[in-house]
A protein has these predicted regions:
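Extracytoplasmic catalytic/substrate-binding loops of multi-pass membrane glycan-assembly enzymes
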Residues: 1-8, 20-32, 45, 196-205
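Loop-to-helix entry region of an early transmembrane alpha helix in multi-pass inner-membrane enzymes
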Residues: 23, 27, 31, 41-60, ...
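Aromatic/glycine/proline-enriched transmembrane-helix motif characteristic
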Residues: 56-59, 68, 191-270
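Specific aromatic-rich, kink-prone transmembrane helix
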Residues: 61-64, 104-121
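Transmembrane and membrane-interface helices of multi-pass
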Residues: 66-70, 78-91
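Short acidic/glycine- and proline-prone juxtamembrane loop motifs at membrane-interface regions
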Residues: 96-104
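Transmembrane helices and adjacent periplasmic/lumenal helix-loop junctions
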Residues: 103, 122, 126-148, 169, ...
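Perimembrane helix-loop-helix junctions
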Residues: 140-165, 176-177
């Protein structure tokens, strides 16, 4: 598979290979895989070990979130949450079957939510920055952070600059080895053009109105999908301001977060299962 070819190239080029891009994942993931090549492991096992480790981090983080804010039976609810996350079919297939790394960035997003509601915004945005350094999909959480800023005034707009700063910091080993600084930006810019299909096996808005396998619709709706998503998210911001929605409530925050992520998946182009 493509993961095996990435492994072979990274192992062959050693640490100096960080100066060149391998695959289409961001630099921090390439650094982790380089470190794994130093161990006597089969490539596929190594990828899956990394992902499975973060499955446990994700389960623990989610359990911590529930334990921190549950009003009763906290221990039981935390244990049930931990079990539900770790034994979820989505989590199991994603990591141990497909060797994907989604549990990495989602773990840090959960930790960010936990620390945000513990009134530790710097730590929260550091975790968001780490998540963003691993996966572009972290941007799905950004709108709800803007809502939180507007609603509560408990964070500063300056906190948002922590996100790109952490991305740069985590990519520094590759920059030191000679990687062009602009690569930090172009990696994600190129990802937005990956697939060139309006939707990829994702039952979203575009699956209802066009043939997802026809590349014509990708070019027809790509820019429209961005404007539509921004418009829908903007309407929600207006509602939050007009209705004076209090996002200090964790329950309200989580519901708004779920709606925000769902909106991005439903209306952005090239979403896949």
């Amino acid at each position: 598979s493509f993961l095996n070819s990435w492994w072979s190239i990274i192992k062959l080029n050693d640490f100096t290979g960080l100066a060149t891009q391998v695959g289409n994942y961001n630099i921090p993931y390439q650094i982790i895989i380089y470190l794994m090549t130093l161990l006597p492991l089969n490539a596929l096992y190594a990828y899956k070990i990394v992902s499975i480790i973060f499955d446990f981090v994700l389960a623990i983080s989610t359990a911590m979130l529930v334990y921190s804010f549950a009003k009763n039976n906290r221990r039981l609810k935390a244990i049930l949450t931990y079990s539900a996350v770790l034994l979820s079919a989505t989590v199991i297939f994603n990591s141990s079957f497909w060797a994907q790394c989604d549990s990495i960035y989602t773990s840090f997003i959960i930790l960010a939510i936990l620390f945000l509601h513990k009134d530790k915004p710097i730590a929260s945005f550091v975790f968001i920055g780490i998540a963003f350094a691993f996966k572009l999909q972290t941007v799905f959480i950004i709108p709800v952070l803007l809502y939180y800023w507007i609603s509560t005034k408990k964070i500063s707009i300056l906190h948002f600059f922590i996100i790109p700063a952490l991305d740069v910091i985590m990519c520094l080993p590759a920059i030191i080895m000679g990687r062009p600084f602009i690569d930090i930006i172009t990696i994600y810019a190129e990802q937005t053009d990956y697939g060139k299909l309006i939707q990829m096996n994702c039952p979203n808005f575009y699956a209802l109105i066009c043939d997802g396998n026809d590349i014509t619709y990708y070019y027809l709706f790509k820019q429209f999908s961005v404007f539509l998503t921004i418009a829908v998210l903007g309407i929600m911001m207006c509602i939050i301001i007009y209705k004076k929605v209090d996002l200090k409530s964790l329950e309200t925050f989580l519901l708004t977060t779920a709606w925000t992520v769902f909106t991005c998946i439903m209306f952005l182009s090239s979403m896949h299962e």
